[in-house]
Regions:
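A residue-level signal for conserved active-site and pocket-lining positions in enzyme catalytic cores
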Residues: 16, 59, 68, 117, ...
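Mg2+-dependent endonuclease catalytic cores in nucleic-acid-processing enzymes, primarily RNase H-like
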Residues: 77-192, 211-215, 222-224
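Charged alpha-helix within mobile-element recombinases
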Residues: 7, 190-205
Length: 224
């Protein structure tokens, strides 16, 4: 009963009702700005304290946007994305090198110390540059559908939140959609657009939080 009220769309049909529903429309339709977007500085003024390790998840692009997201654990046991970096070589008409992105990362982090930088494993040259500069790197688990399901669960259960400053991430939550052409052939996959913040978010959640205590990721009632 508790899950029935929390899920909607394709997640509700598959995981609650056990139906094979076509994946269409907004992927994270459970994301609500009024619930998931918070003013971290205001919360800290009211008693939120960040504890333990901090992480950065990165979706790396050359022409496509590169995104850094900073993740911090609150004393309420929820995770907060407290800061966002977004740079598009295409939009800015100027690509950055691996070393320029690493310098941007250092400047963006300032005095913040991180446990790991979580990066898409395909970004080999960028990972090498990070390691050369003394960062500890964890290669992201890039399971797309399982990762999406976990992010959906974390959003639904109120375990992840985003600071008001994370503008591009908020935009992508509203425009990240299922690929309807693929769905017609029985394949679930997102449209490869408006997905760079979404990929970065998924990398962190699926790499670091999938074994988090108290989270049970729903599986479809019936396999296809």
């Amino acid at each position: 009963a508790r899950y029935r009220s929390m899920y909607s769309g394709v997640f509700y049909d598959r995981y609650i009702k056990g139906l094979w529903a076509v994946a269409e429309g907004i992927i994270y339709d459970m994301f609500k700005k009024e619930k998931h977007v918070v003013d971290v500085s205001e919360l800290m003024a009211n008693g939120l304290i960040f504890v333990g390790d901090k992480y950065v998840s990165i979706d790396y692009g050359t022409q496509n946007p590169t995104v850094f997201l900073l993740w911090e654990l609150g004393n309420d046991k929820n995770w907060y994305c407290t800061s966002e970096y977004h740079y598009s070589g295409r939009s800015e008409a100027s690509q950055k090198t691996d070393s320029e992105y690493v310098e941007d990362l250092k400047e963006w982090l300032g005095d913040t110390k991180t446990r790991f930088i979580i990066v898409d494993p395909s970004a080999a040259s960028f990972i090498a540059e990070l390691l050369k500069n003394g960062f500890k790197v964890k290669k992201a688990n890039n399971s797309v559908l399982d990762g999406i399901r976990l992010v959906a669960t974390l959003l639904t259960e109120g375990k992840i939140f985003f600071d008001v400053s994370c503008i591009e991430t908020q935009k992508e939550f509203g425009s990240y959609v299922w690929d309807e052409k693929a769905a017609k052939h029985g394949e679930d996959k997102p449209v490869k657009e408006n997905d760079h913040c979404m990929d970065s978010c998924r990398y962190f959640c699926y790499t670091m939080l999938r074994r988090m205590s108290g989270i049970s990721v729903l599986k479809p009632k019936n396999s296809r």
